[in-house]
Structure formats: structure tokens, C-alpha cells
Curated annotation (Swiss-Prot):
It is found in: Cytoplasm, Cytoskeleton, Perinuclear theca. The lineage of its organism: Eukaryota, Metazoa, Chordata, Craniata, Vertebrata. It comes from Mus musculus (Mouse). This is Cysteine-rich perinuclear theca protein 1. It comes from the Eukaryota. GO terms for cellular component: acrosomal vesicle; perinuclear theca.
Length: 168
């Protein structure tokens, strides 16, 4: 019995030691990572995208000298022509959603109607004398009126010409 008790005691002690070793290992690794963070101050800087880094390194804009590229949206005053051109070229590479497709169709329809309205010129109207206007008005009014068709007379003696309808 004493031997069994010693084995149990040693096994629990070994398990406790192993658990303590694991905990100390975890503590050491966390301390190491904390030291690395303290030594490397760049990790504390806010994260920037590659595009914004390129913008900061590129030469200044031609219109406002804001030190960002013309395609960047971080500055509203940058060259709108180049931004518009850029958005049209990159449109090919993205997948268009249903909503986007509907808005594109609306925009195309609007542009077509505007171009058609520009093409259609109003016809010049000739000045008519008052007598010509009245003649044109009455001729147009009479053209719409049609003569009533002749209706055959109805015989009162036979209300139902068909015998089948009268019997039912």
C-alpha cells in the first residue's frame, strides 16, 4: 500500500510539475512577444494600405500640390478627369451586381434620350392668316365626324324572330 501511495504521490507531483512547466513556457513566450513589440515601434503605427503608401511616396498632384496621386480618393481636389478615366478602365475587372447593372442601364437610356432630343430639331411653323386657320380648323373638325349608318326598322308584331327563344 505504501508503494502505491508513493507512486500516486509521485505521479501527481510529476503532473503538477509538467503543468507548471507549460505555464512558465507560455509566460516566457508572451514576455518575449511583449519585448519584441517594445523593441519594434513600427508595429504601433497605424496600418496603411499599399495604395496610401504609394500615394505618400509619389510626387505631388498637378492642381493642388497635396502630395497624393491623381487616382487617390483621399483628396477631393485631385484631377477629376484622370480619376474618371481610371474608374472607367477599372470597371472591366470588377463583377457588376444586379443593382449596378440596373443603374448602368438607366444611365445609358438617359444618354440615348438626350442624344435623340439633340438630334430632333423642332419643325419651323409657318405663320397662317386667320382665314386659313379657321378653314383648317373646320376641315379637321369635319374629318372626324362620321355619318350615322342606317338602322333597319324593327317590327313590333314579332318580338322574337326565332321560335326557339320564344318557347323557352
Amino acid at each position: 500500500m505504501a508503494q502505491m501511495a508513493k507512486k500516486v504521490h509521485w505521479s501527481s507531483a510529476a503532473a503538477g510539475a509538467a503543468a507548471a512547466a507549460k505555464i512558465s513556457k507560455l509566460e516566457k513566450t508572451t514576455k518575449r512577444f511583449k519585448l519584441i513589440k517594445k523593441r519594434n515601434p513600427s508595429s504601433k503605427l497605424p496600418k496603411r494600405s499599399s495604395h496610401s503608401l504609394l500615394c505618400s511616396l509619389s510626387r505631388s498632384c498637378c492642381c493642388c500640390r497635396c502630395r497624393c496621386c491623381c487616382y487617390c480618393r483621399c483628396c477631393r481636389c485631385c484631377c477629376s478627369r484622370s480619376r474618371r478615366f481610371r474608374s472607367r478602365t477599372t470597371l472591366k475587372f470588377f463583377q457588376i451586381t444586379e443593382k449596378g447593372e440596373q443603374s448602368l442601364q438607366r444611365r445609358i437610356r438617359r444618354q440615348l434620350t438626350r442624344s435623340q432630343l439633340e438630334l430632333i430639331e423642332p419643325e419651323p411653323t409657318m405663320a397662317l392668316e386667320p382665314s386659313e386657320i379657321t378653314v383648317a380648323f373646320f376641315s379637321h373638325k369635319n374629318a372626324n365626324v362620321s355619318d350615322p349608318e342606317e338602322v333597319p326598322p324593327c317590327l313590333d308584331s314579332d318580338p322574337f324572330p326565332n321560335g326557339d327563344l320564344a318557347s323557352s
